[in-house]
Amino acid sequence: MFLGGTISTPPASLRLRSTLNPQNAVTQSSSQATFPAAMQRKPPSYSISDEDLESRGFLLRRTTEGLNLDQLNSVFAAVGFPRRDTAKIEVALQHTDALLWVEYEKTRRPVAFARATGDGVFNAIIWDVVVDPSFQSCGLGKAVMERLIEDLQVKGICNIALYSEPRVLGFYRPLGFVSDPDGIKGMVFIRKQRNKK
């Protein structure tokens, strides 16, 4: 699925540095940058405010600091993802351009998670969108996705895609994702299994 909208590239001055890749960061002093009112971004409007989430005991995190990979792996398994090698999860997170996870304050455990990879300029793919089954239907998935999409757009990312199982397409559509926009089809390489003789 692809995030619907116009494909365009914002000026480099609007791109923010990545919180996960500081060695690639480009910063600009706010005193150097002035933008016409039409170019200034409005504050994001989320379905659940950060304050409301916090009042309910949910803490938003945008870095891997404090993220227990064994606990995250348990959330993956609880939603039906295969259990993963935590060393490989760590490598995947090192190559992640943006992420957002929710920590439940009472248990200090991750209860929702999503991440994105991409080229840092034009394209990103969202991966691993999960919400612990005990915390589903309270808006955490939507809260994570709204903020991750906003984080990518603020960086100037124009094309945002994700892979989705058919049963959850209805979750992504209200967020702006469309299947097969303008006839575009996603394709996946599948390694052929060798016949054992």
From Swiss-Prot:
The active site is at 172 (proton donor). Residues 23-46 are annotated as: Disordered. Residues 58-195 form the N-acetyltransferase domain. Disruption phenotype: Reduced melatonin content in flowers but not in leaves, reduced leaf area and biomass, and delayed flowering probably due to lower expression level of ent-kaurene synthase (KS) and FLOWERING LOCUS T (FT). Keywords: Acyltransferase, Chloroplast, Plastid, Transferase, Transit peptide. Inhibited by 5-methoxytryptamine in vitro. Autoacetylated. Residues 23-34 have a biased composition (Polar residues). One of its GO terms (molecular function) is N-acetyltransferase activity. One of its GO terms (cellular component) is chloroplast. One of its GO terms (biological process) is N-terminal protein amino acid acetylation. It comes from the Eukaryota. Optimum pH is 7.8. Expressed in green tissues. Accumulates mainly in flowers and young leaves, and, to a lower extent, in stems and mature leaves, but barely in roots. Pfam families: Acetyltransf_1 (PF00583). It is found in: Plastid, Chloroplast. Acetyl-CoA binds at residues 129-131, 137-142, 165-167, 172. Residues 1-37 form a transit peptide. Belongs to the acetyltransferase family. GNAT subfamily. Oligomer. This is GCN5-related N-acetyltransferase 1, chloroplastic. It comes from Arabidopsis thaliana (Mouse-ear cress). The gene is SNAT2.
